[in-house]
């Protein structure tokens, strides 16, 4: 038997699932998420192998959906010191790199920056030649300041990356062996957002290297040292560890994508609204052709970026959300007891009224835990408060669902996540509400079943290149990216080609997006 293991880290629990060649679930488990993330992953994996009676020799891949990078950025902890080099003077000097970043995050990544002459027009022609002397001087300053990675961004490098590539060569000459990230490798249109994502990626390399090293050691301790490691990406695809080590920013919101993708795997439905309810938040996203609908931009740790990421609405309403009653007013969330639910929830003998307590008392959910006694809630909380609180919870969810819809027509809603049991089977604006088997493990299942992929977004001017040649170039680059991420050459197909006119640029400009 060939087994794949998927592991996904949430704010409260770390889920693991083992699947066979037919994507059928063999076994699924939960473990507490830990502050360092890694030990929670190891415990979940150890539990899965033991309880599922899994032979290590049968495991062909372990796929991780991890919050290592998101936690590091949000907590400003463990990030590497970065030298940010922008190519685009004098046109881009009005706004410095990292200017609008939160001060503590800018300090955490070092705040070192330089702007040099160079860059390209949207057509790919030079604005001005790259000033190689300025690049070399900047690299020397970075070296003497002890930077641990360099982030290079250039105007319209997604059209012509020539200046970024040459600048990287010069930096390598000055600082041999230093990790270098170029913005054309990271994201798309929009210099500042692309630059931000590139700097965050460079700062995160140190964190991801440490995480991968730790996870490899953990796999070795479980007899899985020869098993390939993959990491789920923000767009619902996956990539090998050596690729993610270079581009860790591609994993920053992957757990959310895993749940949306897992909903598709569990139901076979390609187009739907997915509600993933955990212990702290509910994330509402959209399935489009079996993959998460993508957002145009995403804020990470207070910084605007334009990396590929799922388009979601997140609300502070989940299993651990605290319910507060003041007279006739009932407020649910956003504060949550999180993983302390089984200690602080009234049904478990605690003193905090939570959303789970309300759903238990309402009778819409049952929990197979002898310590959980719904009668405790009924005895301590008036029935009218339970009714009012539950109505408020449902109203909040329905409003969030409405925000992700693009038409007033009723949509299919799929409920997943550990907290999905607390929702009713009828919701306003939904033509059907589905909670599939293994809904609580949809996130790990999404990681386990993800395919290796590559996405490219490039700008072209049809005054300088034919449409067919532009699509061919973008498609070939997407295939190369998929191969770099670990896809077998003979298995790669171009699955999506999107062409968007750019009317704010002259010369019949377009953006072409290709997914392989």
Residue ranges and their predicted role:
Residues 1-516:
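N-terminally biased helix-coil "hinge/interface" segments that flank
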